[in-house]
Amino acid sequence: MAKLTVSDLDVKNKKVLMRVDFNVPVKNGVIGDDNRVVAALPTIKYIIENGGKAILFSHLGRIKTEEDKKELTLRPVAQRLSDLLGKPVTFVPVTRGAQLEDAVNGMNDGDVLLFENTRFEDLDGKKESKNDPELGKYWASLGDMFVNDAFGTAHRAHASNVGVAEAMKADGKQVAAGFLMEKEIKFLGEAVDEPKHPFVAILGGAKVSDKIGVIDHLLNKADKVIIGGGMTYTFYAAKGMSIGNSLVEADKIDVAKEILAKGGDKIVLPSDSIVAEKFDNDVPNKVVEGDIPDGYMALDIGPKSVAEFKDVLKDAKTVVWNGPMGVFEMSNYANGTLEVGKFLGTLSDATTIVGGGDSTAAVKQLGVGDQLTHISTGGGASLEYLEGKELPGIAAISNK
């Protein structure tokens, strides 16, 4: 079902309430990575260039104490957004009340306003995170229409996405996806529901438990599922192989056995690993094939696995990659992840979609982002979408 998008709305002279995902790393008032702010620009610009008033709101981190508020204010984000837009952004340091209402009512067409971190509302009974209906209604009352561009929180039913959307729709107001949300739905949705074949999924990361649902769902859709990262060794254990001191989720070995039985030759596991005696970048390491020797732990896929994975990928028409092949944050164990990222950049005939923090970081480090079809901004949201789940934040957007 196609969703209403911001380009379907008549925003002129309208107060457009827009949920953005400005959950960026901030330390002592300095933003570490403004990627998510940049990703929201096309929708913000569309609203203001077409004569609308953009009222933005977002969460940032988790608020558990009054002290957290100082470190997790959105004020530095408003400043960064102002720099990126080249125009003033009014920052309102509250989440409700007369100060916010007056600021909204004083806006001119083309103005941009950002109000304070929605999770400030969590100090008093988790009103944001538990989707308090009164809070959703209050925020909805600030705008004439609602645009949700925060894919990163689409898997959560919070007051600032689902609550606002439901209240808006109950008032007969329009609820639409922003351009970023639209792009995520298009690429992730098409990759899973209407992929061009061969379709190869690459799933990495430390824990099988994080990816069980995704592996299970994608085995029904993909031609091959490549498994790398720490979770490899839970599968090794399920096959009765030796894993030395490698990471293993003992309580997931039976699940891994079921996945191997279901997947058969669709599943591609690493055939060799780079191992060391300690979880340390500076100790000697070596390449071993198959079983991991006693006293050693596997920290990356080996060169043979890299070559085999490339062989599986070379004819692919759709590739979805989520999760690193090894301990990416240690330079000696980043090679598997970097090699996969580099190779995806050469697949010019394929739709290539990357999600997850380490995979995205690898792509950036390599500078191959422009050669890929789509880099997803949602961590947990991407995974749940790849599991085939309906995400509440997306479900709440009006259909066309």
Curated annotation (Swiss-Prot):
Alphabetical GO CC annotations of the entry are: cytosol
Q: In which pathway does it act?
A: Carbohydrate degradation; glycolysis; pyruvate from D-glyceraldehyde 3-phosphate: step 2/5
GO molecular function list: ADP binding; ATP binding; phosphoglycerate kinase activity
Question: Quick one: which residues bind ATP?
Answer: 211, 329, 356-359
Q: Which GO terms describe its biological process?
A: gluconeogenesis; glycolytic process
Q: Which Pfam families match?
A: PGK
The family database entries (PANTHER family) matched by this protein are listed as:
PHOSPHOGLYCERATE KINASE (PTHR11406), PHOSPHOGLYCERATE KINASE 1, CHLOROPLASTIC-RELATED (PTHR11406:SF23)
Family, according to the entry, reads as follows: Belongs to the phosphoglycerate kinase family.
Name of the protein: Phosphoglycerate kinase
Print the organism lineage. Bacteria, Bacillati, Bacillota, Bacilli, Lactobacillales
